[in-house]
From Swiss-Prot:
Listed InterPro entries: At2g31720-like (IPR005508), B3_DNA-bd (IPR003340), DNA-bd_pseudobarrel_sf (IPR015300)
Species per Swiss-Prot/TrEMBL record: Arabidopsis thaliana
Regions recorded as binding DNA: 169-267
Highest rank taxon of the organism: Eukaryota
One Gene Ontology MF term: DNA binding
Compartments it resides in: Nucleus
Keyword line: DNA-binding, Nucleus, Transcription, Transcription regulation
Designated name of the protein: B3 domain-containing protein At2g31720
Compositionally skewed regions (Polar residues) per UniProt: 84-99
Amino acid sequence: MVRGDDQLNGLQGGKRALDILCVATERTVSAFAYEEIGETSTEGDKRRERLRRLRRLINYSLSTTMNSSLSKRLKIDECKNQDPEQNPNRVASSPSSCHLESKRPQKVVSNKPVRNRKPVIVTDEDRTPTEWLIDVMREVNGMDAKLIFVKVLPNSDVDELQTRLMMPWKQILDMDFLNEEELEKIDRHHKKISASDKGADVIVVNSKGLQRKLKLKRWDMTSTSNYVLGLGWNKVVTDNILQRGTRLRIWSFHSPDMLFFAFVLSDPDPAPTECLNLLAKLCEETTCLEALQEANRMSSLVSDTELDLELRL
């Protein structure tokens, strides 16, 4: 039986091999600098951008595979090693029999099958606040910045007919981003205590400083509970040109009297087929560059020879 650490070592070995391939590709391309062959800076920038996207896809795919495989293996090993007598009251302690006893949200687990989505890998770069976010916080006297959510947007989150952003609790990185007053407002709306209860106010801000005021609410579904940004969401989609595949990071922070969500966006990751096309194009361009450099070298040798003959004559 292959243990979790053995499988991890195997996956890490595969990652090292592909890292070597990626670095070799990069060095091959960089060996033919555009300054030496008359290539424009724009063409060079485009080539480096394609290489950057290729490396990002390789690292992303490997990280996803490693995390998913290791998690499954460790879960299987844990179940096999568990003593049945340690939990004789399994039915009574099932998550489906639990209920929320306070307004502080608890992550809900269901025993019903749900549609699996690829996990979003959160990197160290994701957890580093951007400069514009820090500037916005200074302007409004903001504090307590937290990375609370990372999501690759599906069609449903940018569909103008659905008009909402869904934030499942089990995907939220830090549930402790709301104060007691905001929790109270969300809870009152969820329980439909009064028609005047609309949820908690939140201001969404982007890198351009554009702000939109929305309502944060709670929706319960079969598989999980969610926080939802609803009315006015379509304007946010338009403001930020959100589309299917956009990678969205949400940072929360508080001014003295308001909750803020800062939207940090990344371009959609390239598809695997695009990755292969990029690699093929890089190899083709590298061959052309090598041929051009060799032609320039031969031309230089011919010129030197002719000059030498003229001097001798």
